[in-house]
Curated annotation (Swiss-Prot):
Places the protein is found: Cell inner membrane
Reaction it catalyzes: UDP-2-N,3-O-bis[(3R)-3-hydroxytetradecanoyl]-alpha-D-glucosamine + H2O = 2-N,3-O-bis[(3R)-3-hydroxytetradecanoyl]-alpha-D-glucosaminyl 1-phosphate + UMP + 2 H(+)
Entry-linked HAMAP family: LpxH
Binding site for substrate: 81-82, 124, 162, 166, 169, 197
Keywords of this entry: Cell inner membrane, Cell membrane, Hydrolase, Lipid A biosynthesis, Lipid biosynthesis, Lipid metabolism, Manganese, Membrane, Metal-binding
Upper taxonomic lineage: Bacteria, Pseudomonadati, Pseudomonadota, Betaproteobacteria, Neisseriales
PANTHER family in the record: UDP-2,3-DIACYLGLUCOSAMINE HYDROLASE, UDP-2,3-DIACYLGLUCOSAMINE HYDROLASE-RELATED
Entry EC number(s): 3.6.1.54
Pfam hit, one: Metallophos
Protein name (Swiss-Prot/TrEMBL): UDP-2,3-diacylglucosamine hydrolase
Length: 240
């Protein structure tokens, strides 16, 4: 049976064209073209201020994902903490299906829970408070009514503050809370969890389930997880 691929945390931006090049290389590969599905679990872009922002980066990425979708490969997207404002307009343009924060998949007989991963980091209370605020639909609607320049400046300011705060936060609170994560997996009656966000690529064998953490993309490295009937494995981009 055809495999499924999982990626996240590419943080694409015009400042790092090498990351976009890595993505295009993967999307154009024969492996991706022969997949049953590709799942993008958030933070595809380093920031997103609205589907109405038209740029060469956004357009080229949407075009290449659409080409893959047009080949019959199902492409799914879960919003991340950087691109949570991606909406149906961009997803339609790219030929992607937008998924909720949590989804359960039947992958070759294994019930698999997928999410971006930021909701699992419950020890970072300041971030969870911030997340709750910015995910209010009314606030998002008001934000998207602002001129694009204002939104871009505000997003840049928020990123600067977030970067400074991250430098002084203890590393452990920026990882998933083990007890909460286990409860979520049990609540969805899953056998496996796949998430991103923490940038700590690894396959963990927890008590009663497997937790797979997708890594971030940087320089010449792309974190790509292949799932098929034999299990799940990270495969270097050179293999595609």
């Amino acid at each position: 049976m055809k495999p499924a691929y999982f990626i996240s945390d590419l943080h694409l931006s015009e400042k790092h064209p090498e990351l976009t090049a890595l993505l295009l290389r993967f999307l154009r590969s024969s492996a991706a073209g022969q997949a049953r599905a590709v799942y993008i679990l958030g933070d595809l872009f380093d920031f997103w201020v609205g589907d109405d922002e038209v740029s060469e980066l956004n357009t080229s990425v949407a075009r290449e994902i659409r080409k893959l979708s047009d080949k019959g490969v199902a492409v799914f997207f879960v919003r991340g903490n950087r691109d949570f404002l991606i909406g149906q307009d961009f997803c339609r343009q790219a030929g992607m299906t937008l998924l909720p924060d949590y989804s359960v998949l039947d992958l070759f007989g294994c019930k698999t829970l997928i999410c971006h991963g930021d909701t699992l980091c419950t020890d970072d209370r300041a971030y969870q408070r911030f997340r709750k605020i910015v995910h209010r639909k009314r606030l998002q609607k008001l934000f998207l009514m602002l001129p694009l320049k204002w939104r871009t400046r505000l997003a840049a300011k928020i990123r600067r503050v977030s970067k400074m705060e991250k430098q002084v936060k203890p590393a452990d609170i920026m990882d998933v809370n083990a007890a909460f994560t286990a409860r979520q997996v049990r609540a969805f009656n899953a056998e496996r969890l796949i998430h991103g966000h923490t940038h700590r690529e690894h396959i963990h064998h927890e008590n009663g389930f497997t937790r797979i953490v997708l890594g971030d993309w940087h320089n010449d490295y792309a974190s790509i997880l292949r799932v098929d009937g034999d299990g799940a494995v990270f495969v270097p981009l050179e293999k595609y």
